[in-house]
């Protein structure tokens, strides 16, 4: 869980609550979901919070939430932006592994030591969370006075360039250094370069940002010393690069909102992707950023009342939304429905339940009255839950390591890297349940089978000793028009054996032992499956019903996952053991 350091003197200044004590702040923030963790040596208060509210990674974001909580602010706030005076030109030489860029110009910012520390903390916390350790998105913040833009043509606005460079063909002075280094030398000799070297290693060209004077940023590794931000900086240039345009745009919004809270003016920049550059398909080749357009979600009145257990008037719910920093209107049809406007720094509102949570926090969870449900039964474990544990115990007894993998995946992992085609008749090849608005390209659908999850885990553990025998009892789903929900949800049992002598017989022996434990009759007639080797693949038939597949993983799949040892695997439906 993310932990943010808060200077309460800064918090008092940003909220206007100069008489509020530290203890009162702790209590108020607990009501917002931030739990006090302790104090630093510098007497800063540390708060832990759920990682969904990334806008609270700075004292400015926490202060904004408190101002809404106190009723000092209401509804959606969108900072005014000035028209672009700077352009970011994206060259076709940018490496495909990090193709996207965004940015903003900040003017009139007043950075004392506290504000600068907060900005650096926000930058690093966003790197660690939304930026996935800078792999998905990285932020560079520069003193604009030290950036010299070169107009592309006479009379045009100044521009900088995002391009790919030869790792040994250019040099610059990085932060915390005095001598010029090439990008490769930064990775080898600089402490920060060594920390993030794995993000660019293996690339033919490294990402770099240039102005008229030369390279001043080597994302996602380090900035140049020339544009270092200090307490004397009054105008800033913020640039973000990454693998997903949506992610870096939202990270940029959070940074801009934090600086706006300090009285800064936000100026947009133009982002132009050149012919041959990888432009974001959903936005086009010419962007204006930051984009402060609001989003909209809807939620029904009945859903809010049912989940919170409180009878509300529509006006009360609108009031709660406004005190949560949202705007809402409603329609009086058979069921009252609220159309809710969401500000651009709220990256956590993905589902109507997130809106219900906002209403609950604005109303005050302390004000909810607990009551026992009117149920005349005694609770107990479901039969399937007991079966799952029994199967896990059996697998562990056979030498498997029990796993719990993500149920979300992508088409690339579920199908492409497994040599499987979506919609095929092969086990695991069913049509997937896809996410309408995926938060990440890595999680766009529910998995249709579990073996890809096991193979991915083996891929991440090639540095560990063999044998590696892993298994999972987990969830899988696929589209099925015969179901009332159009989705068939099942629990699957999967196991994989990775070792020098892994074979069909080794996997079959483990599978037979599991079936024997549950007195199930196992048959394994020969079959074909694109993820497995022909002639070394069989269907799993339990008590006369085809419920899975077993075999030696195809060499093409092993190569795709950089596995240098054979792998044999099996998977079947859990309910077959009932």
Swiss-Prot record:
Q: Which SMART domains does this chain map to?
A: B3_4, B5
Q: Where is the B5 domain?
A: 292-370
The reply to whether Repressor figures as a keyword in the UniProt entry is: no
Where does the UniProt entry say this protein principally localizes? cytoplasm
Q: Which residues bind Mg(2+)?
A: 348, 354, 357-358
Catalyses which reaction(s): tRNA(Phe) + L-phenylalanine + ATP = L-phenylalanyl-tRNA(Phe) + AMP + diphosphate + H(+)
**What are its GO cellular component terms?**
phenylalanine-tRNA ligase complex
- Could you tell me where this protein is found in the cell? Cytoplasm
A GO molecular function assigned to this protein is:
phenylalanine-tRNA ligase activity
**EC number(s) given by UniProt:** 6.1.1.20
Gene3D superfamilies registered for this protein in UniProt: 3.30.56.10, Bira Bifunctional Protein, Domain 2 (3.30.930.10), Phenylalanyl-trna Synthetase, Chain B, domain 3 (3.50.40.10)
Q: Biological process GO annotation list?
A: phenylalanyl-tRNA aminoacylation
Q: List keywords of the entry alphabetically.
A: Aminoacyl-tRNA synthetase, ATP-binding, Cytoplasm, Ligase, Magnesium, Metal-binding, Nucleotide-binding, Protein biosynthesis
Q: Per the entry, which co-factors are needed?
A: Mg(2+)
Q: Which InterPro entries match?
A: aa-tRNA-synth_II/BPL/LPL, B3/B4_tRNA-bd, DNA-bd_dom_put_sf, Phe-tRNA-ligase_IIc_bsu, Phe-tRNA-synth_IIc_bsu_arc_euk, Phe-tRNA_synthase-like_B3/B4, Phe_tRNA_ligase_beta2_arc, PheRS_beta_core
Quaternary structure note: Tetramer of two alpha and two beta subunits.
Describe the family membership recorded for this protein in Swiss-Prot or TrEMBL: Belongs to the phenylalanyl-tRNA synthetase beta subunit family. Type 2 subfamily.
Quote the protein name from its UniProt record.
Phenylalanine--tRNA ligase beta subunit
User: Which gene is this protein's source?
Assistant: pheT
